[in-house]
């Protein structure tokens, strides 16, 4: 049986100044997943990002951290997907989510972009919204005028702990997600 998910994308912004910001929660997840799978990232200019290949028992899974800024993430996703002939429904995108309380997780296929510029660009470049999303809750600042500053700043120590806990819990669901056991993954991830 081969893997159902063939590419996992973590969204974030490149550069030291963004490393610890809420908007980079997808990168945090992908770094942990690469460590768990003993996969090493390498800069790949033709894919506009850092790429790692995880050789798993049921086939390779590609890990991608776009080196474009968030609003150009689709360029990297589409380049890797086209090169390796990966269909949108074989892609998992892991990203920060304002509309979910800090530390909570949601998993879904398709849907709107919720104003997330990375998702908007991925949808535009793939021509569809039908890819999987692992949404890591970062909470909302309470006022939409504060959103940009909120996502581009470091979380408090308590919020960082909650996000790290969500990443750890999400990693436990990865085997089910990769193998297409959607109901099991959803039930686990959506439980408190």
Curated annotation (Swiss-Prot):
One Pfam family here: Pept_tRNA_hydro
Residues at the catalytic site: 23 (proton acceptor)
One Gene Ontology term of the molecular function aspect: tRNA binding
UniProt cross-references to PROSITE patterns, sorted A to Z: PEPT_TRNA_HYDROL_1, PEPT_TRNA_HYDROL_2
EC number: 3.1.1.29
Substrates-to-products reaction catalysed: an N-acyl-L-alpha-aminoacyl-tRNA + H2O = an N-acyl-L-amino acid + a tRNA + H(+)
Record-annotated site: Discriminates between blocked and unblocked aminoacyl-tRNA: 13
Marked site (Stabilizes the basic form of H active site to accept a proton) residue numbers: 96
InterPro entries named in the record: Pept_tRNA_hydro, Pept_tRNA_hydro_CS, Pept_tRNA_hydro_sf
Main location (coarse class): cytoplasm
GO cellular component, one term: cytoplasm
Alphabetic keyword roster: Cytoplasm, Hydrolase, RNA-binding, tRNA-binding
Localization terms from the record: Cytoplasm
One GO BP: protein quality control for misfolded or incompletely synthesized proteins
UniProt keyword Ribonucleoprotein present: no
Positions bound to tRNA: 18, 69, 71, 117
Family (UniProt): Belongs to the PTH family.
Described function: Hydrolyzes ribosome-free peptidyl-tRNAs (with 1 or more amino acids incorporated), which drop off the ribosome during protein synthesis, or as a result of ribosome stalling.
NCBIfam families: pth
Subunit structure: Monomer.
Protein name, entry field: Peptidyl-tRNA hydrolase
Organism, as annotated: Neisseria gonorrhoeae (strain NCCP11945)
Underlying gene: pth
